[in-house]
Regions:
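Alpha-helical transmembrane segments within multi-pass membrane transporters and channels
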Residues: 86-129, 266-267
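Transmembrane alpha-helical segments in multi-pass inner-membrane proteins
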Residues: 69, 94-95, 212-299
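Cytosolic-side transmembrane-helix boundaries in multi-pass membrane proteins
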Residues: 1-25, 195-197, 202-209, 278-328
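Helix-loop-helix "hairpin" substructures at the membrane interface of multi-pass membrane proteins
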Residues: 159-237
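Extracellular/periplasmic helix-loop junction at the C-terminal end of a transmembrane helix
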Residues: 127-160, 166, 187, 234, ...
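Generic structural signal for small/hydrophobic residues in well-ordered secondary structure
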Residues: 41, 65, 78, 105, ...
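Single transmembrane alpha-helix segments in multi-pass membrane proteins
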Residues: 26, 30, 34-86, 110-120, ...
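Membrane-interfacial amphipathic/re-entrant helices at transmembrane-helix boundaries
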Residues: 1-49, 78, 87-93, 318, ...
């Protein structure tokens, strides 16, 4: 479960080990000196941040949004438009990506949170498709279905390894902030809303205000991920805002485990790796991916991280029970 544990000492050690494992893995990726690994790790970091931003809404607050791609795309187009039109340098354009993502969430959020459950989900989908339609048809400004190509970035970022370490630093800082938010009293209220919004409201907490805040924060981090994507690929298109992109990040979160903080990051890595590997060998890669995803969902019902934690916990419990029986 996301949030503080009942055993502070064990929880702190567990969190430290998680951070060390994640940082060590991504720090060692460039040692292979293969562009494939660096490119894949960059994709995982960006999509992992996007998935973790979404999970603040779904896994923490209990709000299933199909409109997350709107904020992701808004961040990407913010960077792309500002740089291609020569308005601002990259050092200013990238920080504006989360601002625009948050602003869009602040604009759409009050309308969406009036509803709950599947109605909230459908409303977020409708607004996201509206944003996508505007971007897709506005050729004079957004490039329409052609998107924006040749986004200029500082020359130092032309080397994939340099941009990788830059992305790693930004994502680590963003994830640390997300962690603090989840473990704060504010995060505890969000989890209370997920468990029982009526009871939370009965306690005098303005549920809609907290839900809107969660949407804005999630939109900001989604926008940041979109800005990083634009700088990495140096091109963007309207598919960034399509509902299928929201569906992809939902699948990543569920696959990795919505109850685990790092679960969405793991889910992003699994899905991107499977897509790349299978896509090299067959033109019917979507069918294979669908079958693999179905098997993973069946055998890992709580997500990869959640199921592994459950197995480890059961094994530890059996060992403790065995020791207690042997030494009464």
């Amino acid at each position: 479960m996301i949030g503080p544990s009942a055993a502070p000492g064990n929880a702190a050690r567990g969190q430290l080990l998680q951070w060390v494992a994640v940082l060590l893995f991504f720090a060692l990726v460039p040692l292979g000196r293969r562009s494939f690994f660096i490119t894949m790790a960059n994709e995982v970091l960006i999509m992992g941040l996007f998935a973790m931003a979404f999970n603040l809404l779904y896994g923490v607050t209990g709000m299933l949004s199909f409109g997350q791609a709107a904020y992701y795309g808004a961040g990407g187009y913010t960077v792309g438009l500002l740089l291609t039109k020569g308005v601002l340098p990259y050092s200013v354009a990238l920080p504006l990506a989360p601002v625009v993502g948050a602003a869009l969430a602040l604009l759409l959020g009050p309308l969406c949170i009036r509803l709950s459950g599947v109605y909230f989900t459908m409303l977020t989908l409708a607004f996201a498709e509206l944003v996508w339609g505007v971007v897709f048809k506005w050729y004079g400004f957004t490039g329409g279905d052609n998107g924006i190509q040749g986004i200029p970035v500082p020359e130092w970022f032309h080397h994939p390894l340099h941009y990788y370490y830059f992305t790693l630093a930004i994502v680590v800082a963003a994830v640390a902030v997300l962690r603090r938010i989840v473990e704060s009293p504010f995060g505890a209220v969000l989890q209370s809303i997920r468990e029982n919004p009526e009871r939370t409201a009965f306690l005098g907490i303005r549920v809609r205000r907290y839900q809107l805040a969660a949407m804005v924060i999630s939109g900001a981090f989604s926008g940041l991920a979109g800005g990083l994507f634009a700088g990495f690929h140096r091109s963007i298109g309207p598919d960034m805002l399509h509902w299928t992109k929201s569906g992809e990040v939902i699948l990543m979160s569920i696959l990795g485990g919505v109850s685990s903080f790092f679960g969405p990051l793991v889910g992003a890595g699994v899905i991107l790796f499977i897509e790349d590997m299978i896509g090299k060998y067959t033109e019917f890669w979507e069918i294979w991916i669908g079958g693999i995803m179905l098997a993973i969902v069946v055998f890992f019902p709580r997500g990869v991280i959640g199921t592994l934690y459950q197995w480890t916990h059961r094994k530890g419990s059996r060992e403790r029970d065995g020791n207690a029986t042997a030494h009464p």
